[in-house]
């Protein structure tokens, strides 16, 4: 959290109204999780207190709105991207689905409490496949048995299929569809193209132009639209015994084709294998096998996902442009840096486009 005793006391007071029966609250052990991304600031901490005359403690997670421009494009006008949209989506999914979501403590829109909007949720214990270094090169995934690796990926795809069964209207998530907009792939393509062009300004990005031209000529029909996670990948799941204990990071949630989520999942599989030249470990299913796993869990046929995999890589390349713009604005990189143009996301996109050139 931000430095300063006063803010810690304000968080204590805020928690005192939300941790039922807790008195004498103290906060300790603040730390940032390993592999934190570029969106909302995250802090893990422990709250100790008394309840019914007995000492107790609870591990919690604080997510603060970043002062920087949001990483993702705004799906719903009037809703902040980083914190607001994520808390609302998680609340709806906890109430209207069996998707594993962390228990929520509360959401605060009043920036006077900690200087920024924030929410607090309970900590969910488990392991997370990190991407620096890649989990396909070291860590628990490499140490796992081939059977457990396969079981883990299959379980993640089962959770994704379960998410896609959620009726967004019954769950109260219809606010994710702006008035007058037909949700689906065509709308998402428009949204992301506008987002990337705005971030590029007058700079040229030939690979983005090539990808957009290819995508525009091949917009598929959507099987249906549903709640899309927006950042579906193993690294956004907390795993326990190779099973999803908690899905995280819903900043990019939208109402779109379920194939958009699956394409993002498969693009990230490419990103941790072919993009860096890392061989698939024994037991790891191929992308075709993963598509079949998802189809079996979803109970529907899933066709060629090349469009959605390339669309995913295009979005990822656009996100890097946005993140690099933020980095330059903060004075952390020089204005003439070219990471926005040359990075692992563009390598991934280029490799995918080579297959269709």
Q: Predicted regions span which residues?
A:
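Juxta-kinase regulatory segment immediately upstream of eukaryotic protein kinase catalytic domains
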Residues: 1-27
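Catalytic-loop of the protein kinase fold
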Residues: 227-229, 234
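Conserved protein kinase catalytic-loop anchor
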Residues: 225-227, 245
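ATP-binding pocket architecture of kinase catalytic cores
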Residues: 31-208, 218, 224
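Activation of the activation-loop gatekeeper triad in protein kinase-fold domains
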Residues: 248-253
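Active-site activation/catalytic loop segments of kinase-like enzymes and analogous catalytic loops
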Residues: 259-299, 312-331
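Helical subdomain adjoining the active site within ATP-dependent kinase catalytic cores
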Residues: 304, 318-357
